[in-house]
Amino acid sequence: AAGQVFATLLLADKSGVALDPSAQDDRFPALNDLEPSSPDQAAMTLGTALFVPSTSNDQRLEPTHRSVAEYLAADWLGKQIDSRGLPLQRVLNLMLGFDGKAVPGLRGLYGWLALKSLKAQHGLIKNDPLTVALYSDPQPMDVEAKKLLLQEIYTQTAANPSVLWDLRGAENLTPLFQAELRNEYLKALLDPKRDDSTQTYVVFILK
């Protein structure tokens, strides 16, 4: 229930849920307006530590931690896509900007969805690998997904070396390394080219 509530709030760009009609506005709809599939369970979720009162009005609740909201929302969406027939494109229509990449406010949700939906994983990686690398945890991904992630990041840096600016936010990418990917790393490290895109990629994999 929490995952569905968070997914709806994030995709609709809402701040939280209003407990009282007097507290409702465009940023804080009533729970019923979110149309949860299990209204009683969703209402119980609002009473957990996942939500805290808004500083503007104690009759409004906000997610306690946005990162937790993104993770739980992605987990719920992943299950809907993989097992319940939710079309991925319907979700992407709400997540992507004019450039085809995740909009800034939904990059966390996008990154976690690439981990949580096996059906959508490769497509999400190909479309926006940097968001997946920076806003998710690649550690649980299988070797093929990690290999694809590395390859797509290289492709993007080759097309636009300025993505190094985004990569500065990557604190620790060791989850992307494992023995089976050794050749992928060696290929980049031994590449004789010294152009901007190649060096950008080498900086990325050495983080």
For each predicted feature, which ranges?
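Extended helical regulatory/linker subdomains that flank P-loop NTPase cores
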Residues: A1-I81
